[in-house]
């Protein structure tokens, strides 16, 4: 019977009596790492200069033109600290930055902390400790853990989004966006002051037949506020009474509950701050083409923005027109009913007092009147998430007792409300064509509504696949074909019918061609404490005013407690009461905003968690600037377009940004939006924040669950005869093994501190970089870490005697084979480091090290390049060996070895020899051997001769440099 621990048991090498005194052990690695980290800090090894400002060269010299800006998605400093999955991307970017620094590039690499958020606030609620106290303690621990890894960051540029000096500029950017509007003619944001100037000059119309000069102050403010890029709106939001706050869509699970706390979430209307990101839909789409980003991420953003071309159609009612957007105006004759979102503004105006005499009982929701039915239906769906509402389950809905006029045929169609139509998408209304849409077909079948065939498959077009189906009594037909039952469209194909119907609608004044987007404006407010306060106050008329820059920052006040008012989790009718409302002296303030001192009240919401991360790349470029978020010279140097290097369409931005694909849409879309506004307003020269993006994979590990499906600590599980057991509190139990993302929730975390203690940080770095391609997920196995450690021990032994500690290098010349392998390794690792292929770089270094070990090579000419090549992966070990090789200066700034092209040319080539397609032998010939010489060598090979057994080949094909194929 075998019993093997499956968890992360200690693997520290113990100092046995026979262990050489100067062996590279975990203990020696720790000493070397601490010493070099201290020296790097003292010398400012990774400090990098700016063109201007406090970080400019003290001697007034110019900064190098050849720069490189490398950035990680910064971490949230949780109380649990790091596990071994977290450093994967940080180590990869450090290897990349170190390589380019060694080649002479001026590299900016820094790391801050995304520190606002719910976890610190919830801890504060539970303990009464200020969130800042907990957050700053967590940051100290994160810096300690990250510091052990030897990451070459410019520590002068580090910050937290919770630093007042940082969020002052978050508030400043908010005001820039608030004080801007989007000029559709120029396709860019412009200052609101310019809009007002155009109104005053009469060069821009107010609309609705009104003149600016005839409006009073309040009306003028309303006109301007309606055009701002930040605006207040009564929006349908995700209200979570159990958390006392509004949640963004991404914070709600698919079953309509809060991601944190698992509380019910309800859809309701609240007055909220919104950002008009939709104004930038086309630019956000178009500029994806110039970004060096993974195709997967670009596709996700394109789908999220969701651009589609169709027609806007107006259906007349007694309470006003219902506008719908459709990509299939050709099917308008098949629209037999309409559906509004239950929250649609028109519902309360359209709903009838009584049911029509012949109403179908299925349409009434069991209510006595349409109004009662609407109220009951709204209550029944209040807790459903958007995803739940759109899933293909049984269709529900209510007839509201009203009808609309189909503009194609003037027929009256009943108007329903149903949960599968969402108020926040499109117009919040659809024309239902059950013959051409399966969802509409399901609804029509459920409620006994007419289903009309309007597109008929054409079976007599040779080679044309018109799609299955066509019998609309069985299912909707969504394929191509010709129009039927469609009046003047009959006989047209779908494409022609779309164009014809759109033209008819436009001519009749009942519609027009239109482009629609799935993207919605950004809900930009949270009813929490631990976030950036809004630089907004309200006057006695409840009108919002942006604060002037000289009144920034608006600092978070202390409050009696940090929790919002929490409600019964099922109380959908409750209203938010944010924690900041409790700071009454802070809320009620007297200010002079240019028209004398007046009483105002501050906004008591805070910004969402995405605010700081939407611009933080700019602060790395100029972290100590008190006059601007980033000096233009510094932004242009680090992030400005470089068409000579990246092509004429270069948008500028950070040279490399690495982080998880989970941020593909929200963070990256929001940061692109903010950056484009800043670009339009002249604050930055780059039109995109991130020129190149790489998504690292996950580190995964085995996890274990008991019979209830609950996770148990992986480190405590043992394996016996292929089964797994956990010594639980009530005795040992058998558990199930599964594989998943490493982390706290699966109880399979491994701390990097453990690996650093047992092997050293350089071993952890080499192991994580050797596990596979950066973009791929990879399995963690602590037992395999020793392989990386043994590789570093071999490198150490090539330079240092384990017995004496003396340097053992010589000045011997290198033989031809070693020279060729050395320069192939230099060329290969340089290419790999530049392409983030750190796993293959490590493999090449291991191959070269093994060659030197087997051949007992001790020549300085072979070992110094090895140390330099190892440096990006294992910088502490490399620095120490470089010092022992007689160099006083750090190797952090290179030089990285340069391959000699002469040794990259092969003198000989090995040809596999195939006989009838199968390899039967191999021959080595001169690289420049002619085809007849290669053929002769192949036919003379002993194995080939034996296989031919005297037979004469019909043909011999020589593929130069690749293979020989003998055909019998």
UniProtKB/Swiss-Prot annotation:
Its EC number is 6.1.1.4. One of its GO terms (molecular function) is leucine-tRNA ligase activity. Pfam families: Anticodon_1, tRNA-synt_1_2, tRNA-synt_1g. It comes from the Bacteria. It is found in: Cytoplasm. Keywords: Aminoacyl-tRNA synthetase, ATP-binding, Cytoplasm, Ligase, Nucleotide-binding, Protein biosynthesis. A motif ('HIGH' region) lies at residues 75-86. A motif ('KMSKS' region) lies at residues 741-745. Residues 1-13 have a biased composition (Polar residues). ATP binds at residue 744. GO terms for biological process: leucyl-tRNA aminoacylation. Residues 1-22 are annotated as: Disordered. Its main location: cytoplasm. It catalyses: tRNA(Leu) + L-leucine + ATP = L-leucyl-tRNA(Leu) + AMP + diphosphate. GO terms for cellular component: cytosol. Belongs to the class-I aminoacyl-tRNA synthetase family. HAMAP family: Leu_tRNA_synth_B. This is Leucine--tRNA ligase. The gene is leuS.
């Amino acid at each position: 019977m075998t019993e093997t621990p499956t968890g992360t048991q200690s693997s520290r090498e113990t100092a046995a009596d026979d262990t050489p005194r100067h062996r590279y052990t975990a203990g020696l690695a720790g000493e070397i790492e601490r010493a070099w980290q201290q020296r790097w800090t003292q010398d400012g090894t990774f400090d990098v200069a700016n063109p201007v400002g406090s970080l400019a060269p003290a001697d007034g010299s110019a900064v190098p033109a050849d720069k490189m800006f490398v950035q990680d998605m910064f971490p949230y400093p949780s109380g649990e600290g790091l596990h071994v999955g977290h450093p994967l991307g940080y180590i990869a970017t450090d290897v990349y930055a170190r390589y380019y620094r060694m080649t002479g590039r001026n590299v900016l690499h820094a790391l801050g902390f995304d520190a606002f958020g719910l976890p610190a606030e919830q801890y504060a609620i539970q303990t009464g400790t200020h969130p800042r106290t907990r957050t700053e303690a967590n940051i100290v621990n994160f810096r300690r853990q990250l510091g052990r890894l030897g990451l070459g960051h410019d520590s002068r540029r580090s910050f937290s989004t919770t630093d007042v000096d940082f969020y002052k500029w978050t508030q400043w950017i908010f005001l820039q966006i608030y004080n801007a509007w989007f000029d559709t003619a120029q396709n860019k944001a412009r200052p609101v002051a310019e809009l007002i100037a155009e109104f005053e000059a009469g060069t821009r119309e107010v609309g609705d037949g009104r003149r600016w000069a005839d409006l009073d102050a309040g009306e003028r403010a309303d006109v301007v506020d309606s055009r701002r890029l930040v605006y207040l709106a009564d929006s349908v939001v995700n209200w979570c009474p159990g958390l006392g706050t509004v949640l963004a869509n991404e914070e709600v699970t698919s079953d309509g509950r809060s991601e944190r706390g698992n509380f019910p979430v309800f859809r309701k209307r609240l007055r909220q701050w919104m950002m008009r990101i939709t104004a930038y839909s086309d630019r956000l789409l178009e500029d994806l083409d110039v970004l060096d980003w993974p195709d997967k991420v670009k596709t996700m953003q394109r789908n999220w923005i969701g651009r589609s071309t169709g027609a806007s159609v107006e259906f007349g009612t007694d309470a006003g027109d219902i506008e719908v957007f459709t990509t299939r105006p050709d099917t308008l004759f098949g629209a037999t009913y309409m559906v509004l979102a239950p929250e649609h503004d028109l519902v309360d105006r359209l709903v009838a007092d009584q049911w029509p005499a012949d109403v179908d009982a299925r349409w009434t929701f069991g209510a006595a009147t349409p109004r009662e039915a609407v109220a009951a239906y709204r209550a029944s769906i209040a807790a459903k998430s958007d995803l739940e509402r759109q899933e293909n389950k049984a269709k529900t809905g209510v007839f509201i007792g009203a009808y609309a006029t189909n503009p194609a045929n003037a027929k009256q169609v009943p108007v329903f409300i149903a949960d599968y139509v969402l108020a926040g998408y499109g117009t919040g209304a659809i024309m239902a064509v059950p013959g051409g849409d399966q969802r509409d077909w399901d609804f029509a079948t459920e409620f006994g509504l007419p289903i009309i065939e309007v597109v008929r498959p054409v079976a007599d077009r040779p080679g044309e696949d018109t799609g299955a189906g066509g019998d609309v009594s069985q299912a909707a037909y969504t394929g191509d074909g010709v129009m039927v039952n469609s009046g003047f469209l009959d006989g047209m194909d779908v494409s022609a019918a779309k164009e014809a119907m759109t033209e008819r609608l436009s001519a009749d004044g009942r519609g027009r061609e239109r482009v629609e987007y799935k993207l919605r404006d950004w809900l930009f407010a949270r009813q929490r404490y631990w976030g950036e306060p809004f630089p907004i106050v309200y006057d006695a008329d409840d009108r919002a005013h942006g604060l002037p820059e000289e009144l920034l920052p608006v600092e978070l006040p202390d409050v009696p407690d940090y929790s919002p008012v929490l409600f019964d989790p099922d109380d959908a009718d409750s209203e938010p009461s944010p924690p900041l409302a409790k700071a009454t002296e802070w809320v009620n303030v007297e200010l002079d905003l240019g028209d004398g001192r007046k009483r105002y009240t501050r906004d008591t919401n805070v910004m969402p968690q995405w605010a700081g991360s939407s611009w933080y790349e700019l602060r790395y470029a100029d972290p100590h600037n008190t006059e601007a978020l980033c000096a233009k010279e510094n932004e242009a140097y680090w992030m400005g377009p470089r068409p000579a290097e990246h092509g004429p369409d270069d948008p500028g931005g950070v040279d490399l940004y690495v982080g998880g694909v989970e941020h593909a849409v929200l963070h990256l879309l929001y940061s692109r939006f903010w950056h484009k506004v800043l670009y339009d307003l002249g604050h930055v020269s780059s039109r995109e924040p991130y020129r190149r993006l790489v998504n690292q994979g996950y580190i995964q590990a085995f996890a274990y669950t008991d019979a209830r499906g609950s996770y148990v600590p992986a480190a405590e599980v043992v394996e016996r005869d292929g089964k797994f057991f956990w010594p639980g509190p009530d005795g040992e139990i058998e558990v199930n093994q599964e594989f998943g993302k490493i982390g706290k929730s699966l109880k399979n975390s491994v701390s990097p501190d453990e690996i650093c203690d047992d092997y050293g940080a350089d071993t952890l770095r080499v192991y994580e970089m050797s596990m596979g391609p950066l973009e791929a997920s990879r399995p963690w196995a602590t037992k395999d870490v020793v392989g990386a450690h043994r590789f570093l021990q071999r490198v150490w032994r090539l330079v240092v005697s384990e017995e004496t500690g003396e340097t053992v290098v010589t000045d011997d010349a290198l033989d031809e084979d070693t020279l060729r392998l050395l320069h192939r390794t230099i060329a290969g690792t340089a290419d790999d480091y530049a392409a983030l292929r750190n796993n293959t770089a490590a493999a090449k270094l291991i191959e070269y090290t093994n060659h030197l070990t087997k051949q007992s090579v001790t020549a300085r000419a072979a070992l110094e390049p090895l140390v330099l090549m190892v440096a990006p992966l294992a910088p502490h070990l490399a620095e120490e060996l470089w010092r022992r090789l007689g160099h006083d200066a750090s190797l952090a700034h290179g030089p990285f070895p340069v391959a000699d092209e002469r040794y990259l040319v092969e003198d000989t080539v090995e040809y596999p020899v195939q006989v009838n397609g199968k390899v039967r032998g191999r021959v080595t010939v001169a690289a420049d051997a002619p085809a007849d010489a290669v053929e002769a060598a192949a036919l003379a090979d002993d194995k080939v001769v034996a296989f031919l057994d005297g037979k004469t080949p019909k043909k011999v094909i020589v593929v130069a440099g690749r293979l020989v194929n003998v055909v019998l």
